[in-house]
From Swiss-Prot:
One GO cellular component term: plasma membrane
Endpoints of the signal sequence: 1-18
InterPro entries, sorted: AB_hydrolase_fold, Peptidase_S9_cat, Peptidase_S9B_N, Serine_Prot_S9B/DPPIV
Coiled coil, from the record: none
Tree of life domain: Eukaryota
Keyword field: Aminopeptidase, Glycoprotein, Hydrolase, Protease, Secreted, Serine protease, Signal
Full protein name: Probable dipeptidyl peptidase 4
Lineage: Eukaryota, Fungi, Dikarya, Ascomycota, Pezizomycotina
Single annotated GO MF: serine-type peptidase activity
Length: 773
């Protein structure tokens, strides 16, 4: 018998109200309610965790960590002893981060930190001798202008980038490797778009395992259009007469992209060879991944994509000769191909059609319809599946060459969960390392030789961390228990979170996370806030520990008491390729339909105040909120749009064209996906709020400005529309207390919406849209 949607929701609520207590879950039997300061401003109610730098020594299981007093220590799992290598009083002033050399002889410090983009920053770098504790600058004349620095695996040299040029340091000698770096030429570091959309990091250089060679990418931005971001205050208390202007080479849809080249540096004599990756036209080529597939320096794998990222080719570079060959290729024109950055070298194996000399690597692919683990030979041939099924591998976490195992996390139990497994690439046997019959969200960090690991239970209850040996099933010890947090939370009455699946008319099932207010009673009426992100491949509904954040606050404040629903619509991640690809070439359409359908189902519940259902999203979620309002469905009474895209022509090419393809091939799609229809904005009962930072280098303020102009030009009235800019704030909206103001403003609008008793209608609202005089 098939339950109706309403029945499923009622069952879910009943289960949430009487859910069994999980170990380590606060019983929430107290009377205190979460406050704004506790959830938005303070991190006092957040779980603690430790992160370590595993190091390769004679004994596997050594790692480096930083004590609360700032001192740097090495701890050995085998001996259970720790040693201080840099005492707190010897830490350089204004230290931001550190990296110990592989030979443990020195520490590389980054100081004088200045944020650049999402991942990148500028800093000064110092080298500290572990034995003498003396510190010397990496470069004598540095002025907080070094972009990146990294130890070689041997620990006797450093590659670094300054002024967009690649340099090396060896025993105090600094050598310039490139000299033509500048505003349009980047060596060893990505430009803005490669950092944000392709590499997801601040470096584009890779030492070979034996430190003989260094592969690095060069990005040429000649011809890439410039977008200027203005900073009106520029970190000053009083505004300068003229704003500082930052010119960013930012290719938008169908504009010129940066070109990219692969180079290999011979570290012994500082000679550089450029390796042609000519599998696509240079103007179309995107290099998505570079990985050494060798224990020495013989072979390099380069994953290349075409411009719209629906074709990929893995090129193997024979470094001795410079010759290249296409080992594997993929057609993804039914949607797109994600750059998963997962190539991991395994070693020589005698498998399939290969011989004992064939080198193999593992990688993730969804060519079966679900993302799974495969063995690939550098000689080519069909990939060998290591996992299969209607679930997905989410990440490769370690390779154990000695035991011939790949460790990975997957959604085998449920798409909202993560469990840890190993698979033998010799026998193909899969072994769970955690109880995969119990709902949980795990993450893990393995030692250098994969003999030990730190296992992090990340939810749904309060997180903790334990240390394990791969040879034992019981933990060696607990690293963080968060016992104090559990005890503290016993003082509180907390919102109740539950999960369920909502079937939509097309037959797909959507994951939903529901948060019920403190003291929930089915005899009362509650307003609802939908909190989507909804972008391609993203996931918001997961069984991680749900931070006691703004959403928890609005479910706790007695003057708000909102139910929250987070719905992962079609196009989101970890549900298979078909589910993801449904949104290709039509962003915003199906996602909005799904949110509207879910809201209409929620409105049928007896305890939902159907006249007060709001929706709030940030970035893609802000865009989705706009598309939901555009439908003019009447399902939502308030829209809150934070840092939204409003027209995909205004966003960067590499993200947008991955899903929408080019403007010339999908002009109608771009017209449809832009937020241009205004009736829904005119008719939404409680109005809407648009928030955006003027210094947003990612989703430019231009998006909010253009949307605002469209709405005003089409007669949206002032009582419906509120716009808030945040001077100089980037996409995170944190500059000068902006984040606190932002959340206070959201809370104020939600309070106003909850108490809105009737339509707000000024006299001019009764006139035609030409009311402006």
């Amino acid at each position: 018998m098939k339950l109706s949607v309403l029945s499923v929701l009622l069952v879910s609520v009943a289960q949430a109200a009487a859910a069994p207590w999980r170990p380590r879950e606060p019983r929430a039997a107290g009377s205190k309610r979460l406050t704004f300061n506790e959830t938005v401003i303070s991190a006092a109610l957040s779980p603690s965790s430790i992160s370590v730098q595993w190091i390769a020594t004679e004994n596997d299981g050594d790692y480096v960590y930083q004590e609360e007093d700032g001192s740097i220590k090495i701890e050995s799992i085998v001996t259970n002893r720790s040693q201080t290598i840099v005492p707190a009083e010897k830490i350089p002033a204004d230290a931001y981060s550190y990296w110990i050399s592989p030979d443990l002889s020195a520490v590389l410090w980054a100081t004088n930190y200045t944020k650049q983009y999402r991942h990148s920053f500028f800093a000064d770098y110092y080298i500290q001798d572990v034995e003498t504790l003396e510190t010397v600058p990496l470069v004598e004349d540095m002025v907080g202008d070094i972009q990146y620095a990294e130890w070689s695996p041997s620990g006797d040299s450093i590659a670094f980038v300054r002024g967009n040029n690649l340099w090396t340091w060896s025993d105090g000698t600094v050598t310039a490797i490139t000299k033509d770096g500048g505003p349009d030429m980047f060596h060893g570091v990505p430009d803005w778009i490669y950092e944000e959309e392709i590499l997801g990091d601040r470096f584009a250089l890779w030492f070979s395992p034996d430190s003989e060679l260094l592969a690095f990418l060069t990005f040429n931005e000649t011809g890439v259009p410039t977008f200027t971001v203005q900073y009106f205050m520029d970190n000053q208390e009083i505004a300068p007469p003229y704003p500082r202007e930052l010119d960013i080479r930012y290719p938008k849809v169908s504009e010129t992209n940066p070109t990219v080249k692969l180079n290999i540096l011979q570290l012994s004599d500082n000679t550089v060879s450029t390796i042609p990756i000519d599998v696509f036209d240079p103007s179309e080529l995107i290099v998505g991944e570079v990985a050494w597939v060798t224990d020495t320096h013989t072979e390099l794998a380069v994953k290349a994509f075409n411009r719209v990222q629906d074709e990929s080719k893995v090129v193997i570079v024979e470094t001795a000769s410079g010759e290249t060959k296409i080992a594997h290729e993929r057609d993804g024109t039914d949607g797109w191909l994600d750059n998963l950055l997962s190539i991991s070298y395994v070693g020589p194996l005698a498998l399939g059609s290969g011989d004992a000399s064939s080198a193999y690597y593992v990688d993730l692919s969804d060519h079966s319809g679900w993302t799974h683990l495969y063995l690939f030979s550098t000689s080519g041939g069909d990939p060998i599946p290591l996992t299969e099924g209607e679930w997905e591998v989410t990440s490769i976490v370690s390779i154990d060459q000695e035991r011939e195992l790949v460790y990975y996390l997957s959604t085998q139990h449920h798409s909202t969960e993560r469990h840890l497994y190993s698979v033998s690439y010799r026998t193909f046997e899969i072994t769970p390392l955690v109880d995969d019959t119990v709902e949980a969200y795990w993450s893990v960090s393995f030692s250098a030789k994969a003999g030990y690991y730190i296992l992090t239970y990340a939810g749904p209850s309060v997180p903790y961390q334990e240390l394990y040996s791969v040879n034992q099933t019981a933990p060696l010890r607990t690293l963080t228990s968060n016992a104090a947090l559990i005890e503290k939370l016993e003082e509180y009455a907390l919102p109740n979170i539950s999960y369920f699946e909502l079937e939509i008319p097309s037959g797909e099932k959507l994951n939903v996370m529901q948060r019920l207010p403190v003291g929930f009673s089915p005899d009362k009426k509650y307003p609802v806030l939908f909190t989507p992100y909804g972008g391609p491949g993203a996931q918001e509904v997961s069984k991680r520990w749900q931070s006691l954040d703004f959403n928890a606050y609005i479910a706790s404040d007695p003057e708000l008491e909102y139910v929250t629903w987070t719905v992962d619509n079609r196009g989101t991640g970890y549900r298979g390729r078909e589910f993801r690809s449904l949104v290709a070439k039509q962003l915003g359409k199906l996602e909005a339909e799904d949110q509207v359908y879910a809201a209409k189902q929620a409105a049928k519940l007896d305890w939902v105040d159907s006249e007060h259902i709001a929706i709030w999203g940030w970035s893609y979620g802000g865009y989705l909120t706009g598309k939901v309002l555009e439908t003019d469905s009447g399902a939502f009474s308030l829209g809150l749009l934070t840092a939204p895209v409003s027209d995909w022509r205004l966003y960067d090419s590499m993200y947008t064209e991955r899903y929408m393809k080019t403007l010339s091939t999908n002009a109608e799609g771009y017209n449809t996906t832009a937020i241009r229809h205004t009736d829904g904005f005119k008719n939404v009962e409680g109005g809407f709020l648009i928030q955006h930072g003027t210094g947003d280098d990612n989703v430019h303020f231009q998006n909010a400005a253009a949307l605002g102009d469209t709405l005003i030009g089409n007669g949206v009235t002032p009582e419906k529309m509120q716009v808030q800019w945040f001077t100089d704030s980037d996409h995170s909206i944190r500059y000068n207390g902006g984040n606190v103001f932002l959340y206070r403003q959201l809370a104020q609008r939600l309070y106003k919406e909850k108490n809105r008793a009737k339509k707000e209608q000024h006299q001019w609202s009764k006139r035609s849209q030409d009311w402006v005089v």
